[in-house]
């Protein structure tokens, strides 16, 4: 179990839940970061007394410095401040709860210091999984996943090295489960952000609706557990009780179950290999008299998932391009600037137009990321 942490993205959905878990466990929070939500960041800082708060938005950072002038809390600004928060001294673990590819640099910085990474930023592995996992091995840094599915797989595989046959990656199917492609044409942002089982931020809620989130998790699982696309099967599981499963060499299937509450995998990433009492509700099997259900995904109705699985097989910079294009497209959709189907159409166009580079270094990955973002903006003439 760790005793001191830095929380990157403390004002987001996962970050806020991490703060609550840290308070429950009595952890020392050394650093917090936010993009621009300084009202909540100030409240968290006064409650947790970190040594450092990073604000990526420069204007917001200046305002927070003034607000915290009566304290001894240092305030940094810009993306470099994220890295500063990630490598702060006397920190056992870094929770990477920032959204998007911006999480890559601070994650690598923390890895270089040998920190435990409680990884909630899946884009880090989607964009640079080979590099991140290699550096973690070289630096002796633990990567413990926070995503509920990967935490489940991690828990199922603990102590079973060399026994894995297949990963069974579950997903609820999102708010439009069972809808045809045509039926989703007029979906609005307000409809897409309403997830039936989980409480999440707007961007990841849209990704869950399109099932791009499951595609990103598919790629993340490949890197975390050293498997190929053929070793992962995606299953739609509407109840979100079985968070994922593993099939072992002898045909045994082991599953991790629990209520859909992100505080559980967050806490496990911080207490591993120990377990501590949590404040989460307990699973009541009698609440599911109709049983638990599992279905194969309809890839025609879920083209974003199919595209992600295709990019996983292509490898190189293809997942980076897909992820960057999707980030831009989803934010345009949330701003009511493009339609729901335009998310997939623009991301697929970017993947088709930008040739993948095999075995990329970080500079090539960054260039592919920027090219994909520019492509989508140009695609919609923004």
Residue ranges and their predicted role:
Residues 1-382:
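Catalytic, metal-anchored helix/loop core of enzyme active sites in primary metabolism
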């Amino acid at each position: 179990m760790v005793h001191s942490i830095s929380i990157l993205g403390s004002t987001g959905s996962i970050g806020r839940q991490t703060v609550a878990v840290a308070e429950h466990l009595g952890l020392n929070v050394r650093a917090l970061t936010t993009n621009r939500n300084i009202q909540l960041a100030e409240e968290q800082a006064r409650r947790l007394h970190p040594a450092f708060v990073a604000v990526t938005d420069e204007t917001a950072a200046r305002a927070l410095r003034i607000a915290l002038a009566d304290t001894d809390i240092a305030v940094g600004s810009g993306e470099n401040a994220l890295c500063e928060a990630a490598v702060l001294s006397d920190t056992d673990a870094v929770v990477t709860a920032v959204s998007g590819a911006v999480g890559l640099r601070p994650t690598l910085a923390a890895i270089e210091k040998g920190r435990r990474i409680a990884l909630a930023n899946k884009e880090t592995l989607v964009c640079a999984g080979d590099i991140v996992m290699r550096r973690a091995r070289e630096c002796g840094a633990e990567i413990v996943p926070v995503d509920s599915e990967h935490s489940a797989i991690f828990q199922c595989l603990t102590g079973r090295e060399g026994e894995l046959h297949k990963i069974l990656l579950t997903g609820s199917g999102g708010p439009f489960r069972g809808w045809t492609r045509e039926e989703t044409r007029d979906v609005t942002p307000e409809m897409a952000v309403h997830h039936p089982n989980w409480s999440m931020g707007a961007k990841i809620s849209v990704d869950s609706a399109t099932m791009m989130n499951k595609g990103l998790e598919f790629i993340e699982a490949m890197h975390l557990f050293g498997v190929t696309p053929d070793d992962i099967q995606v299953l739609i599981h509407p109840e979100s009780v079985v968070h994922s499963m593993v099939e072992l060499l002898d045909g045994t299937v082991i599953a991790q179950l629990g209520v859909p509450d992100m505080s559980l995998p967050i806490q496990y990433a911080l207490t591993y290999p120990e377990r501590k009492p949590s404040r989460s509700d307990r699973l009541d099997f009698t609440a599911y008299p109709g049983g638990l259900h599992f279905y194969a995904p309809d890839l025609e109705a879920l083209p974003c998932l199919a595209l992600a699985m295709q990019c996983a097989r292509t490898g190189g910079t293809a997942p980076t391009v897909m992820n960057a294009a999707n980030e831009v497209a989803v934010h345009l959709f949330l701003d009511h600037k493009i339609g729901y189907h335009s998310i997939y159409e623009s991301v697929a166009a970017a993947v088709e137009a930008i040739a993948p580079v095999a075995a990329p270094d970080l500079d090539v990955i960054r260039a592919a990321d920027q090219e994909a973002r520019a492509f989508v903006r140009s695609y919609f003439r923004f």
